[in-house]
């Protein structure tokens, strides 16, 4: 018997090890990786918290269950208990083991589920904003109330578990007793048997359940700030004057009922317990009826008046939660009185107008600059650089390896040889070549660089497409980049990676389910395994509690490529704030900067006023750095993120209104403007552009993220919403309200005007013949002083599978007039060189002219030649014919 007991413990440990084998391997690898990236303390924060919490929680569970068990065995006169639980020590030992295992399990479940909420509770940071109903700081609702809710659910669940377990234990032991004594089971005696077996225990548990129902309704009171019963989010008139009153009564009555229940147990009377339970149920039902009556017979007919204070609460706190309360609002009275001098004063803004568009540029990059089939550009980023002494907006992209495209896609190729991408491509957004293609300032492999921007180590071991592990410093040289006659190779000189000791190779072989870690003869002692190379997944693994922007962007600094990811703190617990996309509070509180060679990942706090990020910083010590610790050259490229701006724009469409009466009527709703990308295509929400511009009251150009608003379900533009991001202006938001009594063209309405212009529509129709297609670029509406200049690039895509869209013309509009030109500069000249510095109304004059048939025939001839050249891959001939076609089109006036 002793030998069996001696074998039990090691056997139990072996079973546990097998059951959790993969988790143990993963845990060891995580320790090694977090140690490599210098965030081991962050990783152990969770584990340390769980262990610290488990000890007292285990003791509480163990003692509580043991005492409950002892209370069931205390009366020796109950035969059922004697037979089942008290006849010998074996039952006690068995229960001890059962209690130990269950208590550990429950303690782990509780600790692992709620460690984070407990740490948030203990490290709470005030918002210095109070809710208007209970006057509690917002931090209570975000950092403390979630823990109260969790405790309530756990305790109620445990109490119900005790009740159910007691009944199950009774029936099992009763059945065992009847079988052993050969007696029939009498269902009529169940009630008496239960009372004899655990009557007092069940009564105590019932009293505790009633007590916690009281606590649960106290939580419901606080949760009224999230009510959706009224016309706006948050506590409404009915919630405050009916629901709240009943909740308070229920809290008091259930508290009294729990005391009465416990006193009744002492006196041995069980009838008061039933009465207390009945009163509690009656009050809960009455509350629902009372709220229904108040809403339908008092509020409904007087809703606008009665709900105004609560609508105001919703407006104020929603604006605070989405950082819309600090927007600078200005009237923008459109005068359209620009003179030549105004154009000269805003030359830098006009020179940086984007005529290259995102989608066509990415297509062009992926056809012309991938160099080899296994390279790819994941997306295009937009930024600003001082190039050769001039402030320029640029497109740029990193050339990454697409390992899925490798042929042959062997283990060595995928993990040992093709380990990194190489280089970047950059072009100014405001210029194209004579063929209408992006004019590169950085291109090719090795990089051809026409700028003063140094790019001496352009390797990309960490990027947006680096989704697999690599092993570096092996016996095989890494592929670096292709040359005409051979491939250039490279040896990794960064410090990323985990050493490939035999133990580590074994761990990774198990973890990745890949025996090549052990069989490969190319792996040396000083080789290193680099994992978690995808930049977003890397950031998420270190700080999973942050929300990350969908568009990381690259920066060239110190000869290398760095990645910047915007990180957000979000919650859905902000009182009275209307939820959008499942959140009702957001801040861009951190920027993540990742080195593409070494993988160094740094989290910089960019919003010190955000209590949530400060709460994280207190919990995860050593994770965050101050913004000033980031290199100045990196900080200069911080952008206001589009994901944040998009959700703020969505909220602003409704919450620019501050008057509760106007808000209730819904009479001043906005929506983000629509746009149209194809001449006969569907409309989509306009993508907010980053623009280099001089704000009307400023004397210096800066990069601004700009959105256009329409009146809801109308195409008339009503406002411009901008976010600034250069230097000390970072994060400042400005709203220009346009005249409501004038027709101001939105991007979509501007497209309709283009389509309705007789001369332009004829040229578009000519271009659209025989399979070629005209595409609109990205519409830019540029504010200059008190005027708006509209710019629309036109792309021509020839027929053919591998055709490249080329920017061929630019349409400019000012003061309701349209000019079709080969460039912005030519269009500006055409507009402002007419008499009295006003737009020459060419469209009205041109409408009376007829088009020479011979010119149309010639145009068709050049077009056919261009298409033939394109099919043959002769891009020089293609460009020449397209230029001739453009000259003819310009001459048709």
From Swiss-Prot:
Tell me, what's a Pfam family for it? UPF0182
Name the principal localization, coarsely classed: membrane
* Keywords (A to Z) from UniProt: Cell membrane, Membrane, Transmembrane, Transmembrane helix
**What are the transmembrane regions?**
9-29, 49-69, 94-114, 154-174, 202-222, 246-266, 273-293
Q: How does it sit in the membrane?
A: Multi-pass membrane protein
The UniProt entry's GO CC annotations, sorted and at most eight, read:
extracellular region; plasma membrane
InterPro entries, alphabetized: UPF0182
Q: Where in the cell is it found?
A: Cell membrane
According to the lineage, what is the superkingdom? Answer: Bacteria
Q: Which NCBIfam families match?
A: PRK00068.1
Name the family the entry cites.
Answer: Belongs to the UPF0182 family.
List the PANTHER family.
Answer: UPF0182 PROTEIN SLL1060 (PTHR39344:SF1)
Its recorded name reads UPF0182 protein CLI_0022
